[in-house]
Amino acid sequence: MTAVIFIVLSKDTTQYTAVNYRVIEYKIPLYLKLFNFYGRHLNYSFVVNRITQNSKNDIEKVLDISKWMQNNIRKIPKGVDVVDSHPLTIIDRRLGTEDQFSDLLSVLLVYAGVDAFMWFHEDNYKEGVTIFKVNGKWSVIDPYYGIVFLNNDNRHASITELKNLDLNNGLFMHSLNYERIKSDNIRLIFGNKFNDKDGVIKYYTSMFDNLPTKNKINNSSVFELGGRSYTQSPLSRLKFIIYNYLEF
């Protein structure tokens, strides 16, 4: 029996790493793949527990983890390779793209007990936001720029509100410290991506128009949602494997 286990664990498996969005395949033994997987799981748990040790509720978890990312992970400078093997790669390199910020935040939020997933901009798969659920309501955060969206009651706007309200009048962009985004600090936050507030509003309006509805999200399996947030722990990965087997 021991010999059989040894043979199985020594079998080669395929590992994938993306460099500048081109996927590279290489072989590693199964035992090493399992060892690395569990090591990443422990790392996620450790990082999240440290960040959220003083968080009083789920909203504070969302903000505390997002602030930690803003302080510890930089935007990838021009000319530097984009590397992605696992979400932990982003933490190890302390560098991330827009989609990597959103993917990593969703992973860390799920480890913190907050439902979350990454959602891509329909017109550009490299641009994404994180959709999270607090108090039964799905909301949106843009962790790359550190932007949250509040309604007129100064509460995190729901997806329904984001899809229906006018960003100019009924919805306001705020920093992670709840400071309102004004025209004179657009360049400070977004760099050269936008020339003025109108460009920012147009960008987010286009994105929110295509957000999935609350019902669509609630009626979908977590494994059908975007990103890798629900497949990083051993139990969730097992559920994912079973789900794919049953679907097949």
Give the predicted meaning of each segment.
Residues N71-K133:
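Active-site neighborhood of thiol-dependent amide/isopeptide-bond enzymes
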